[in-house]
């Protein structure tokens, strides 16, 4: 089974993120969920983003890198929204990455290096009308990634919600989250 390093979104390590990790764990995968916010959890995306901005987004990425140091190299990196930054950065730069799943966000590949690494499959998931994912360049970055990487998939879901896969937030979309979970489990099974 796969070993996964899962990074939470800007609201923190919510009950919904923990639930997603538990679902992967129940399927036999080993899942690590570092708390990059030191216990802080926010009810709104804006409050979480404000916290991340005060700490600095680079701090968030560095905490993610530090969380990976004591773990084996052969990880699948999963990130939700802001958590995509450390997940994508590690998938692109840490030797031995087995795969990546990027949810609600995607940075340009050039942000972390010249090209997506050979042999590292990636999935990107987002809502087609999410003003952050679709309106701030993430969707364009995801399309460019899929167009340049050998094993990359982009899954667009109907709707306009950000953090749609977290059942502990009001933005939760049960149907889209269920489909995302099925696709991620199939992806992880393919890697084992």
Please tell me what each predicted stretch does.
Residues 79-83, 87:
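Gly/Ala-rich beta-loop-alpha elbow adjacent to hydrolase catalytic centers
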Residues 96-106, 121:
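A conserved short beta-strand
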Residues 1-72, 164-165:
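Serine-hydrolase catalytic machinery in alpha/beta-hydrolase-like enzymes
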Residues 124-126, 157:
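Short beta-strand/loop motif that positions the catalytic acidic residue
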Residues 131-140:
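Conserved alpha/beta-hydrolase "acid-adjacent" motif
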Residues 77-79, 103:
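Short beta-strand immediately N-terminal to the catalytic nucleophile in serine-hydrolase-like folds
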């Amino acid at each position: 089974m796969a070993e996964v390093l899962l990074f939470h979104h800007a609201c923190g390590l919510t009950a919904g993120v923990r639930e997603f990790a538990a679902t992967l764990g129940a399927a036999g995968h080993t899942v690590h969920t570092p708390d990059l916010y030191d216990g802080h959890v926010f009810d709104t995306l804006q409050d979480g983003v404000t916290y991340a901005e005060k700490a600095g987004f680079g701090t968030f990425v560095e905490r993610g890198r530090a969380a990976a140091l004591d773990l084996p190299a052969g990880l699948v990196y999963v990130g939700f929204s802001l958590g995509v930054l450390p997940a994508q950065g590690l998938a692109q730069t840490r030797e031995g990455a087995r795969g990546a799943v990027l949810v609600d966000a995607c940075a340009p590949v050039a942000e972390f290096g010249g090209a997506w690494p050979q042999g590292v499959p990636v999935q990107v998931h987002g809502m087609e009308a999410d003003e952050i994912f679709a309106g701030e360049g993430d969707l364009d970055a995801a399309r460019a990634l899929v167009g340049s990487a050998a094993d990359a998939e982009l899954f667009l879901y109907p709707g306009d919600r950000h953090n749609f896969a977290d059942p502990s937030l009001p933005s939760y979309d049960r149907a889209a989250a269920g489909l995302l979970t099925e696709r991620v489990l199939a992806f992880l099974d393919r890697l084992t």
